[in-house]
Curated annotation (Swiss-Prot):
Residue positions binding DNA: 90, 109, 151
Protein name: Formamidopyrimidine-DNA glycosylase
Catalytic reaction list: Hydrolysis of DNA containing ring-opened 7-methylguanine residues, releasing 2,6-diamino-4-hydroxy-5-(N-methyl)formamidopyrimidine; 2'-deoxyribonucleotide-(2'-deoxyribose 5'-phosphate)-2'-deoxyribonucleotide-DNA = a 3'-end 2'-deoxyribonucleotide-(2,3-dehydro-2,3-deoxyribose 5'-phosphate)-DNA + a 5'-end 5'-phospho-2'-deoxyribonucleoside-DNA + H(+)
Keywords: DNA damage, DNA repair, DNA-binding, Glycosidase, Hydrolase, Lyase, Metal-binding, Multifunctional enzyme, Zinc, Zinc-finger
Cofactor: Zn(2+)
Similarity annotation: Belongs to the FPG family.
PANTHER family: FORMAMIDOPYRIMIDINE-DNA GLYCOSYLASE
Taxonomic source organism: Shewanella baltica (strain OS155 / ATCC BAA-1091)
Active site location: 2 (schiff-base intermediate with dna), 3 (proton donor), 57 (proton donor), 260 (proton donor)
Pfam families: Fapy_DNA_glyco, H2TH, zf-FPG_IleRS
Gene Ontology MF annotations: 8-oxo-7,8-dihydroguanine DNA N-glycosylase activity; class I DNA-(apurinic or apyrimidinic site) endonuclease activity; damaged DNA binding; zinc ion binding
Entry EC no(s): 3.2.2.23, 4.2.99.18
GO biological process assignments: base-excision repair
């Protein structure tokens, strides 16, 4: 599933081609995504795209009439293409622009979403209760310590909780905990402030580096230009269960935590 870096890379790739462009059509070939795609052609045709933003793993395409809320789901991608590009399997939606280009949404598994919001986006049910963005000052050790106070849940589950901090999915939670030397099953509320300080710094550094590398391509993700992300070449633990630790040489352990595969080093990462 595309995580925050992959969504941000997509935003950076499509924004220069969308901002200040006029929408001339919205073609919906298959509206049966995670939620039914609303018929918003009347609202969006003729509108000028003002900006393309990201909130958590959602892309927000703003016009004066409202905002398209796009989620890539498990396997979705957005690409800027010439308007006459042949339609391929799983090309479900085209946002057609007056400049002869289209924004094409492809999603083989159809767990993605394309929704519409005429309210301020912070009022939308999907966005209203989200936690802070990890690459902003709002995500800091004081905020994290307060959010974790008294929690008995495993720290990895808390790190992936969008009410605590957004956009840190399975890949980057594994990597950040390894870099911080924290066992993924450590009780969140008992981690001291010094270790939380390191964890916050590692989350920020790893996400920022992943964005610079174009995200992580494991199976489905490609950038807006169709190229893969290269952060997979930098992974220390994710997807490496049973292999040797890059730090100490110990065999990495693999468990299921919150129904997600979790990989860690039992020597380098402590509770």
């Amino acid at each position: 599933m595309p995580e925050l870096p992959e969504v941000e890379v997509t935003r950076q790739g499509i924004a220069p081609f969308l901002v200040e462009q006029t929408v001339v059509d919205l073609v919906i070939r298959n509206g049966s995504l995670r939620w039914p795609v609303p018929d918003i052609a009347k609202q969006i045709i003729g509108q000028v795209i003002r900006q393309v933003r990201r909130r958590a793993k959602y892309l927000l395409i703003d016009t004066d009439a409202g905002t398209s809320i796009v989620h890539l789901g498990m396997s979705g991608s957005l690409r800027i293409l010439p308007h006459d590009t042949p339609v391929e399997k799983h090309d479900h939606i085209d946002l057609v622009l007056a400049n002869g280009r289209i924004l094409r949404f492809n999603d083989p598994r159809r767990f993605g979403a394309w929704l519409w919001c005429e309210l301020p986006e912070e009022a939308h049910p999907l966005l209203a209760k989200l936690g802070p963005e990890p690459l902003t000052q709002a995500f800091n050790v004081a905020q994290l310590a307060a959010a974790l106070a008294g929690k008995k849940k495993a720290i990895k589950l808390c790190l992936m909780d969008n009410h605590i901090v957004v956009g840190v999915g399975n890949i980057y939670a594994n990597e950040a905990l390894f870099a911080a030397g924290i066992h993924p099953e450590a009780e969140a509320g008992k981690i001291d402030i010094e270790r939380l300080t390191v964890l916050v710094a590692e989350v920020k550094q790893i996400l920022a580096h992943a964005i610079k590398q174009g995200g992580t391509t494991l199976k489905d993700f490609t950038n807006a230009d169709g190229k893969p992300g290269y952060f997979a070449q930098k992974l220390h633990v994710y997807g490496r269960g049973g292999e040797t630790c890059t730090s100490c040489g110990n065999l990495l352990s693999e468990i299921r935590l919150g129904q997600r595969t979790t990989v860690f080093c039992g020597i380098c990462q402590t509770r």
